[in-house]
Swiss-Prot record:
Keyword Iron: no
Gene name in the database record: hemA
Protein name: Glutamyl-tRNA reductase
Family (UniProt): Belongs to the glutamyl-tRNA reductase family.
EC number annotated for this UniProt entry: 1.2.1.70
Organism: Cupriavidus pinatubonensis (strain JMP 134 / LMG 1197)
Entry keywords, A to Z: NADP, Oxidoreductase, Porphyrin biosynthesis
Binding site for substrate: T52, C53, N54, R55, S115, E120, T121, Q122, Q126
Note: During catalysis, the active site Cys acts as a nucleophile attacking the alpha-carbonyl group of tRNA-bound glutamate with the formation of a thioester intermediate between enzyme and glutamate, and the concomitant release of tRNA(Glu). The thioester intermediate is finally reduced by direct hydride transfer from NADPH, to form the product GSA.
Length: 434
């Protein structure tokens, strides 16, 4: 069975390309079905898709594709067709990781070593969601199940035994730092949050600590926005929840806008921001777009009075704290390397399972036949001692027939290899019976 991880992330591609191959949550299950069909049929092929603002990754286990170029080209072709993105645009930015490299990558991703925010924990939850979705889609099997269960265990071990999460600057904290560079005080600003998911909740928590003048939450489902607004109000803030449709009329009211929705198209266009800036009499407005695909049209960045930041822009602020954790990174890498070797040993042992089953089936067939023969001998009154002698002798002869026949008929290097191997097999068998 071949393991393969193919992906694109914040280190290999800009957000302008990552957003073109992102998978909305509702599209992942049908995409998994299409991918498995593309990989030469569903039977025996396992797959999972991880899609976040910083990465899109496909994990596969298949005995159909060969490792290396064939698996890469096959999966690249599917990804290109599925998202209608030319393969020539994707290929330079994709990484293809077979076997142990795929295992190591999964362990590093879950442990936060491959994240823009080194040591962040959100990716572990996102990976668990991806595995749960793949399980519900019926695309997980023995190999990926084992890979991901060990991945979660390794992530727990890394976080428990190292300080990989210490000194971490989250994306949410980075957004606040940028706001503090633009405005003299966040406490005098009006803040708009668009969306009500986990990332917006994290951002809202960090901004709330700065006691902004007003916080408004805009969401497609107003009830969810109201819930977040109520939580912030409990911290003594002036809050309000509005519908997403009200954005056009109210955008000019806000000094800071933080957006992170699951929309596949921008929800804030250039024209809307131009009108807002005009109504603000050209007072500056800071916009943080944490969504992939992006919520704010990129052309907005050209406006003089708008400071627009994407997830890639926030990465520079985040990396300021990464150097402080290099000792923890070395510890984490050592743990991961050890666990990769353990998993690869398990994977290699899986290749002999069919042979073991075949041996067990053949042995059981011999046992049943000789046992039935012994019962017939006892039924006709034969001496039990003689029956046992005949039973044990027949079992010995039949079990040894295959190896002795091979030793007598093989030639050359094959025979020499068998001569070296067989005595060790029987010594092991003898020890195991004691």
């Amino acid at each position: 069975m071949q393991l393969l991880a193919i992906g694109i992330n914040h280190t290999t591609a800009p957000v302008s390309l990552r957003e073109r191959v992102a998978f909305p949550l509702e599209q992942i299950k049908p995409a998994l079905g299409a991918l498995r069909t593309h990989l030469a049929g569903r039977n025996g092929t396992e797959a999972a898709i991880l899609s976040t603002c910083n990465r899109t990754e496909i994990y596969c286990a298949t005995d159909i594709l060969k490792p290396g170029a064939e698996g890469f080209e096959h999966t690249l072709r599917w990804l290109s067709q599925h998202h209608n993105v030319p393969a020539s645009d994707l290929a330079p930015h994709l990484y293809s990781l077979p076997q142990s490299e795929a295992v190591r990558h999964a362990f590093r991703v879950a442990s936060g070593l491959d994240s823009m925010v080194l040591g962040e924990t959100q990716i572990l939850g996102q990976l668990k969601d991806a595995v749960r979705t793949a399980g519900e889609a019926g695309s997980l099997g023995t190999y990926l199940n084992q890979l991901f269960q060990r991945t979660f265990a390794v992530a727990k071990e890394v976080r428990g035994q190292t300080e990989i999460g210490a000194h971490s600057v989250s994306m949410a904290a980075a957004a606040v730092r940028l706001a503090q560079r633009i405005f003299e005080s966040v406490s005098t600003q009006r803040v708009l949050f668009i969306g009500a998911g986990e990332m917006i909740e994290l951002c809202a928590t960090h901004f709330a600590a700065q006691k902004p003048r007003q916080v408004v939450v805009a969401n497609r489902t107003v009830e969810r926005g109201e819930k977040l607004a109520e939580q912030l109000a409990e911290q003594g803030l002036t809050t309000q929840a509005i519908r997403l449709q009200e954005l056009g009329e109210r955008l000019h009211e806000f000094d800071i806008v933080v957006s992170c929705t699951a929309s596949s198209l921008p929800i804030i266009g250039l024209g809307a921001v131009e009108r807002a800036v005009k109504r603000r009499k050209h007072r500056p407005i800071m916009m943080v777009d944490l969504a992939v695909p992006r919520d704010v049209e990129p052309e907005v960045a050209r406006l003089d009075d708008v400071f627009l930041y994407t997830v890639d822009d926030l990465g520079a602020v985040v990396r300021e704290g990464n150097a402080l954790r290099q000792a923890a990174v070395a510890q984490a890498e050592a743990i991961i390397e050890s666990r990769v070797q353990n998993f690869m040993h398990w994977l290699e042992t899986r290749s002999v399972v069919p042979v073991i089953r075949e041996l067990q089936t053949a042995g059981e067939s011999i046992r049943q036949a000789e046992l039935e023969r012994a019962r017939r001998m006892l039924a006709r009154g034969d001496d039990p001692e003689a029956v046992l002698e005949a039973l044990s002798g027949a079992l010995t002869r039949k079990f040894l027939h295959g190896p002795t026949h091979a030793l007598n008929h093989m030639q050359g290097e094959d025979r020499e290899a068998l001569v070296r191997l067989v005595p060790g097999l029987f010594r092991q068998s003898s020890h195991s019976e004691r």
